[in-house]
Amino acid sequence: MEHKYNKGSEWRKWDLHIHTPYSIYQNYGGTGSFDKFIDALERLPKDVKVIGITDYYFIDGYEKVMEYRQKGRLSNIDKIFPILEFRIDTFGSGNENKLQKINLHILFDIGEDNLKEEIKKIREEFISQIPISSIDKHKTKMLSIDNFTTEGGNDLQKGFSDLVPPTAKVFELLNCETWKNKTFTFLGYKEWSNLEKNNQLKPLKEDLYNRVNAFLSATQRETFLNCQKWLNEYGNKKFLHSGDIHDFSFLDTANTNENGDIVQSTNYYCDTWIKADTTFDGLKQIICEPEDRVKIQIDHPDDKKGYNIIEKIKFVDTSGQDKFPCEEIGLSSGLNAIIGGKSSGKSLLLHLIASEMGNKTDIKNYEQVIKNTSIEIYYKDDPTRKRTKDDARIIEFLPQLHIENLVRNQE
């Protein structure tokens, strides 16, 4: 279910840190809670259009989510990315006594048309190439649930806690021809920011900063601006904000009361807005334009009343000669540019829109062209109902010739 876009970049919420019931560390209640998990994802706030299905080292949770999607579920989400969360072999410290493992998140560019093959490729050419730790006896023991369980003394959680895959190997793969243009990387901010404590070296912290594309944080909104300010001391990489969800208490979108009514979410939060298409290339735009493409806030960064926004237009050709394709043309709620050569119909399009909306516009030069042609206009607040003649909404229309005349008169 790949989405096509014809309206330019738009602000949408991206939540790129949601663990599944298949994650090694989670509190959903195990794999039997997957139906409830999907229900919760389907009731995410309507502004959330991109999610990252995040699991430690493995892609099984993403694969399970996509099984539901291929059966018609999760139509509320435009794009679902797989994200592998790695613990790296450099430690930060929140205090003198407690070491904190730094998390590296790896998002993969993956299409849905050939899903099985792409998942297989990630398993075989990425995950299975990395040992479970850097010590000699594990050189031939690659990442797998079985190897973590065996080395943990038949205890998966212990193996997961004790063993850290070699970070050098992870970055070696990320920089190889297969993956360097197919991955986007984040560091967990909190643990990374503690690297200078407990005698850790700042050069190592700077090296990690330079290796990744952005940072993730689940910090509370009140402290987020300060965190971004501290991060800016190293460069212009952006924070992305998410709740780091591991259980239903923070994915409480599927809760119901005793009457079966949906209860408003109280704990779920994600404040990351990205202005881009919901694609991998869209995400990469935040590297080059971090200030223009990312906003961390509760409300829509460019909220406008739907009453005042033209959502789409449609030509109606009754001549039987197929002068115009009877297709809907989506319009951006921001700036729209009409591009075309001389006499290609740019002014005609604007005149038709203005005329349909009740503006007195001189279209005598186009009378023959527009014979048996009209245009339908749809507003954002009711995009299924075309505008009628008694609609009171108006626009201000300044034709090109009118502007030229104003300039000449000024001269």
Features from the language model and the residues they span:
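Generic recognition of stable, solvent-exposed alpha-helical segments in well-folded globular domains
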Residues: 278, 308, 330-333, 344-348, ...
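Alpha-helix N-cap/helix-start capping residues at coil-to-helix junctions, especially the first residue
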Residues: 79-165, 188
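Short, well-ordered loop/turn and helix-capping segments at boundaries between secondary-structure elements
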Residues: 289, 350, 355-359, 403, ...
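Charged catalytic cores and adjacent phosphate/nucleic-acid-binding surfaces used
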Residues: 1-48, 59-81, 86-115, 189-343
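P-loop NTPase motor core
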Residues: 370-411
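Short beta-strand-centered segment that lines the nucleotide-binding/catalytic pocket of NTP-utilizing
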Residues: 360-374
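Aromatic-lined carbohydrate-recognition surfaces of secreted/lumenal glycan-active proteins
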Residues: 171-196
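Phosphate-binding glycine-rich loops of NTP-binding sites
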Residues: 51-54, 110, 332-363
